[in-house]
A protein has these predicted regions:
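Bacterial N-terminal signal peptides that target proteins for export
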Residues: 1-12
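Bacterial N-terminal signal peptides
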Residues: 11-22
Length: 546
């Protein structure tokens, strides 16, 4: 019996031939001739799955990994544009199945690449995270060493983030483990460069949803119940578009694709390492297009988005039973349908000599001001349902944490009980959030801005723009709508990507988790500055032609 996947691939092949015959290939206009360059493209990937137990990132208490559901990867795409009249330019984009990209991971990748391949401009490397909540933690938290010292707590530096030695691979060790492999993937992608072309397109898949529910009293809550009598509406917009960048070799054979989607990979949660729905998506796309295809995921602005279905939750669960597909499998199929549905037209629109420009800039953003009212107002939060001020939270949790820490010191046998670490790490996590908020109140008196790195890239008539935040969707929509480019990919949690949430004014007023002072370094004012400066940088890639 003929495999349905072989039939699908054969149909795609015929469609590609038909579309190639009927549609013109893209070409650079006369005004872009000087900036156009012959492309050389290279792909590589590396397995960054830890070889022993780690703390899993994401959430408000430590989780210790209990095995591997599926591997996590670094996927690298190297693009170099060589020009007849002028210098070449480049970018190496690397997607990581991690919750974020810490500054220390980014710098260690740069150091290793610089040493192994000095011809690579390491400032042109972009690392972005898929924001899976089932991957190793990278948090080293040197600032919390100060908190511990101030209060006479002797916590090993390697375990400052969680407040106690958890007896597994420390974050610092995993960072070195991952950096070595990520740097190797960067080098391999660079060495694999060959002449090729790109095409870009827009498709749609219903996947991510706004995760904030708003109520008639003006408040909103993350994952709040929608079946309450006072439920008013979902707080914000949802973006079901997919930005798709296809890469081709000189013979017009597909080599890989970049998928830009406004949804973090947060279906899975538990104690097993997983790439989340990107594992299912890779499998599905490779079944359709070939095992050799590379897939590079990017999260668009999605700080207030999630795969979780709130309004139609019961209907969605019923459909999973009827179809026999898990939510991750269903997402993988939807993304794959969207990516393959426009493939014939992408094959007919390959650009081998697009305009290519890459700028890296440091943008100064005003820090979110922590007011005295922020510190003294008594309120509950998503992770702390007690009604108390930030200072009261800190004082209470410090006493609780010190008591627990002392118990483990005096009775180490307590660490043999299953889940012994949950309560102490949850307490310490909330304690650290309160302490950092108090520290920021003092810091802002002398340091009012936060510098962030932004990449903007032009490839033909498309643009890519990065930021280090969990950027609320509205800002991404503003950038896409106002951009000079025909199509713009906004990439959050990138290079490095540890800026915290960047919420809208609407969300700040609602008071949900991602918009409170404890969760945010930058507020809505900084969000508008980021949008405007990003747009200026994108426009400069076109204005230089004038």
């Amino acid at each position: 019996m003929t495999s349905p996947f072989r039939i699908a691939r054969a149909w795609l092949g015929l469609s590609l031939l038909a579309a190639s015959a009927s549609l013109p290939a893209a070409a650079a206009g006369p005004e872009s001739e000087q900036a156009a360059g012959r492309l050389r493209l290279g792909w590589a990937s590396a397995d960054i799955t830890p070889d022993r137990s780690v703390v899993i990132a994401g959430g408000s208490a430590a989780r210790i990994s209990q095995g591997v559901s599926n591997q996590i990867y670094a996927t690298a795409l190297a693009i170099e544009a060589t020009r007849d009249n002028g210098p070449s330019d480049m970018v190496i984009m690397v997607s990581l199945d991690l919750v974020g990209v810490t500054g220390i991971l980014y710098s260690r990748v740069q150091e290793r690449v610089s040493k192994a391949a000095p011809e690579i401009d390491t400032d042109k490397i972009i690392l972005n995270a898929t924001h899976t909540h089932t991957a190793p933690d990278q948090g080293t938290a040197p600032d919390l060493v100060k908190m511990h010292a101030q209060h006479g707590i002797d916590v090993p530096v390697a375990w400052a983030k969680w407040g106690i030695d958890l007896g597994v691979m420390p974050a610092e060790e995993y960072i070195d483990f991952a950096a070595e492999r990520i740097a190797a993937a960067v080098g391999q992608a660079w060495k694999a460069r060959k002449p090729g072309g790109i095409s870009f397109g827009l498709s749609y898949a219903t996947t991510g949803r706004n995760r904030l529910t708003a109520y008639y009293n003006g408040t909103s809550d993350m994952y709040g119940a929608a079946n309450r009598p006072d439920f008013s509406h979902v707080e914000g917009y949802e973006d079901h578009s997919l930005g798709l960048l296809y890469t081709w070799d000189a013979e017009k054979k597909l080599t890989g694709l970049v998928i830009n989607i406004a949804m973090p990979s947060q279906v899975a949660y538990g104690s097993r390492i997983s790439a989340d729905f990107w594992h299912e998506t890779r499998n599905e796309l490779r079944r359709r297009l070939g095992e050799e295809i590379f897939i590079l995921p990017q999260v668009a602005a999605a700080g207030d988005q999630s795969p979780k279905v709130i309004v139609d939750e019961r209907a969605e669960q019923r459909m999973e039973k009827l179809t026999g597909r898990s939510q991750m499998q269903q997402i993988g199929i939807r993304i794959s349908d969207a990516a393959t549905s426009i493939l014939p037209f992408m094959n007919a629109s390959i650009d081998f000599r697009p305009v290519f420009k890459h700028r890296v800039d440091q943008v100064e953003l005003n820090r979110r001001v922590i007011t005295e009212k922020d510190l003294t107002t008594r309120r509950s939060t998503f992770h702390n349902r007690q009604v108390e001020s930030v200072q009261e939270t800190f004082d209470r949790l410090l006493a609780e944490y010190k008591k627990m820490y002392k118990q483990f010191e005096e009775h180490p046998e307590l660490k043999t009980k299953p889940g012994w670490f949950v309560s102490v790490t949850a307490t310490h996590w909330l304690l650290a959030r309160a302490w950092r908020t108090l520290e920021r109140y003092e810091l802002q008196k002398t340091v009012s801005t936060l510098p962030v790195k932004v990449h903007v890239i032009r490839i033909g008539e498309m643009a890519i723009a990065t930021n280090p935040f969990e950027l609320y969707l509205d800002y991404g929509i503003q950038i896409k709508a106002r951009s000079k480019a025909v199509q713009t990919f906004v990439v959050e949690l990138a290079s490095p990507g540890g800026g915290g949430y960047l919420p809208t004014q609407r969300s700040v007023e609602g008071g949900a988790y991602g918009a409170i002072p404890q969760s945010t370094l930058i507020g809505p004012e900084g969000g508008r500055v980021l949008v405007n400066r990003t747009l200026e940088l994108i426009e400069s890639l076109w204005d230089e032609e004038k």
